[in-house]
Amino acid sequence: MTANNNPRILLFCISVIIIFSALASYVQSSAGKVRVTEITIPTQDGQWLKADLYKPFTATSENPAPMVVVIPGFQRSKETLSNLSIELSRRGIVVISIDPYAQGGSSSSFSTRAATTEGYGMFAVVDYAYETNNLNYIDKTRIGATGHSAGGLAAIRGATYFGKEAKKNGTVSKLHSVFVSGFIYRGFTKKDLQPVSSNIGISYALYDEGAYRNKLKHGDLRLAPEALRIINSSINDKKNHINEITIGKYYGNSAEKNLRVVYNEKVLHPFQPYNREVMANQLMYFEQVFDLKNTLSNNNQIWYWKEICTSISFIVSLIMLIPLTQLMLNIPFFERIKKPIPNILPKPEGKGKILFWILFAISALVAAFTFIPMSELSKTLFVEASSRKQTWFFPQRMNNAIMLWAILNGVVSLIIFYTSYRLFGKKNGVLFDMLGLRIKRSELLRTFLLAIMIFAIYYILLFTIYFLFHVDYRIFFIGIRIFRPVMLLLLVLYAPLFFIFFLSNSLRINGTMRFSNDLQWKTLFFHGLATSIGLLLIICIQYVTFFKTGTVFWTDGWLYVNLLFGVVPMIFFLPFFHNYFFQMTGTVYLGPMITCLVFIMSLLSNTVCYIPI
């Protein structure tokens, strides 16, 4: 990539991002037939919800439409279920897709059990929609809720909550129907279901990793007591109660608010919302309970086109960092940090080669076997965040676990590097100047200022894209999204500690494995594998055990393992950037500074966060 080509490549990247973001927005609005608007809803105790309102133009005061509240699960924002919002709104249903409390742009909650006691905010949305005259284009007798995982728990809790309220007041339930995806082990006792006067649909992954918590310890719902209670709650005469469920069969009557159906698709828990069969089943359910006529076929789906477009934007936005940085390095103030690329390292031979692979294995094993222990340690060190209480002391429960793992592995990597260099490398032709560590204090400061500028430009473009098109950069649930200003404070809190890992990775890749300055794909792939193999080993252990025994290897820690679906791709591609930035500057510092700021802000803005109100 030559200096003369940098402006053209940068312009090309920005153009691609704009074009595919516009296309994603076009799909999201159903080719202009649905208006998508971000709204803020004030709720109890000074709390608030951020939400996206999908209003079909066919929904009017003369022709009011049913409404569905979409509730993402734990660690998810409203964008992660935009596919469902798109398909429901295409079929004439008004959708309010919320950021659950303590996630996305919504505030924290004073409740430590927000999904159960507040429906992650859904209770307040239903109350508002039912009571206000502002939403005169919705049919208040047909308000539904749906959610995945913990969002599914919120949905069934809503059916119980509004059922109790209706019986107490002698009225009908405000919640006409609920659809619960990916959650069944809580919220379905006889006590929970007794007051429900809403239709209920269930979709549960046959290969759900959390199925060990179910009564029968697996995901097959045909004989599951939890699912049987759901179906039998619609049958008044106990003599007619069933002992085995027919998957996909509708029981009960929608008009009497006792319709029940159970789906059991062959899919894993985290990928359940992004499956066409799962989507079709849920669309069929809402068409049935709302008695919709002349709607689109359930298999007529367009949501994946948006995912393709935002995926392209995601990838290109990260590629854009390279020409952007090269262009910025041509500014005289920053040009001073560029140094000649150090001589390549001598390839290890004999004992050196053996030592190289021993250290490679040690690093991988340490990475693999410290992740779950660090996750458990985070619960002890960060008690308030782990208890879902509002706090300024590292308020991100799940990222705290990743942070501890990153610190430990970063320190271990630095120790291994220093020890191998002192005991072996220094004596076998590895000079200090080959490592890319030598830098003046003034140059280090300029490097840091450049990283901040790259970070700012990157996110300014993202905010502009979101303002223009109301989409972000996203591959399913892996997203780079806009953030609240308070997240900049958290970046100052978290980034320095994560930086230990990022710097150690840059040093490892460029200071111990740079046997060539030619960035061939096989070299980059090896570097990516070297960085991520420990975490990949965790995923392999988890799912090989799961498919052989029916139970995941780490049960109580399965949600932490699920985090790795988003973390591993980031870790794998990290060396790609560290290699390129090293080639630009001749030092190991710029790469980890830029990637730490960009990637950690992505982590911070996509997780639960218990910041005080």
Predicted region positions:
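Short, Lys/Arg-rich N-terminal segment immediately upstream of the first membrane anchor
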Residues: 1-7, 303, 345-351
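An N-terminal hydrophobic leader/cap segment in hydrolases
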Residues: 3-42, 50-52
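Hydrophobic H-region at the start of alpha-helical membrane spans
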Residues: 8-16, 313-317, 362, 408-409
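Alpha-helical transmembrane segments of multi-pass membrane proteins
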Residues: 22-25, 322-326, 367-376
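Soluble extramembrane regions of membrane proteins in the secretory/endomembrane system
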Residues: 33-303
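Juxtamembrane/start-of-transmembrane alpha-helix segments at the extracytoplasmic/lumenal side
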Residues: 300-314
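Juxtamembrane interface at the cytosolic side of transmembrane helices
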Residues: 316-361
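Alpha-helical transmembrane segments of integral membrane proteins
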Residues: 358-613
